[in-house]
């Protein structure tokens, strides 16, 4: 069965579960899904039961939620759709990187597998989207990204003066993306850590001579 045959709700839940595991090592729970989606716990709990009944996740009562092999395959298909659409919107239609997430959220449920493959070919089989996120291949392989959180790169003694290259930035906050772009903090930018904040996840960095404070939404190497 193609991922296109799943309901929009099921597609969304699988994608959210995948995304949560991609950005954090924290176990995924119904509570975390509720927080991420803004949906009521009762709705999430019902959805989790249905996903488990379909063999798409494994869920222990009051425990973590894990994708099965089948569920992972569908989730990766949705991630592939989303990131290829974002790339198409930026590279072909001239969208800015802060505009594409919500557009892709709508379009990813409507496109066919055939159209997704055509987009992939048209774009030259890109491996990363405009935010630096890896784009899964047609066979479900997710390209590895050798990077760590900026706050990890700037942690510890002697962090000040560390130079890093931005590899990836979360697209969860369009306003923050716009701020980053206006200040030259984009994928591929070289940053110098000027000061770490031991009791905060933010870091002070310098890019092209200008200083900025950066929250923990970017990955670097």
Can you annotate each of these PLM segments?
Residues 4-39:
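N-terminal helix-turn-helix DNA-binding core of bacterial DNA-binding proteins
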Residues 82-116:
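Ordered, amphipathic secondary-structure segments that act as subunit-interaction surfaces
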């Amino acid at each position: 069965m193609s991922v296109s045959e799943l309901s929009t709700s099921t597609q969304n839940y699988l994608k959210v579960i995948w995304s949560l595991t991609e950005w954090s090592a924290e176990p995924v729970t119904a509570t975390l899904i509720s927080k991420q989606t803004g949906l009521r716990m009762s709705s999430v709990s019902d959805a989790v039961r249905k996903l488990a009944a379909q063999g798409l996740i494994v869920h222990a009562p009051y425990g973590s939620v894990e994708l099965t092999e089948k569920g992972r395959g569908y989730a990766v298909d949705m991630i592939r759709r989303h990131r290829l659409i974002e790339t198409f919107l930026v590279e072909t239609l001239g969208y800015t990187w802060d505009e594409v997430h919500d557009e892709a959220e709508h379009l990813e449920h409507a496109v066919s597998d055939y159209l997704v493959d055509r987009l992939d070919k048209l774009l030259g089989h890109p491996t990363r989207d405009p935010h630096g996120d890896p784009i899964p291949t047609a066979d479900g392989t997710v390209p590895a990204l050798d990077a760590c959180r900026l706050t990890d790169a700037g942690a510890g003694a002697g962090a000040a003066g560390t130079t890093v290259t931005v590899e990836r930035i979360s697209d969860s906050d369009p306003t923050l993306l716009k701020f980053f772009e206006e200040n030259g903090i984009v994928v591929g930018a070289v940053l110098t850590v000027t000061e770490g904040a031991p009791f905060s996840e933010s870091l002070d960095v310098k890019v092209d001579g200008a200083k900025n404070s950066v929250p923990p939404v970017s990955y670097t190497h």
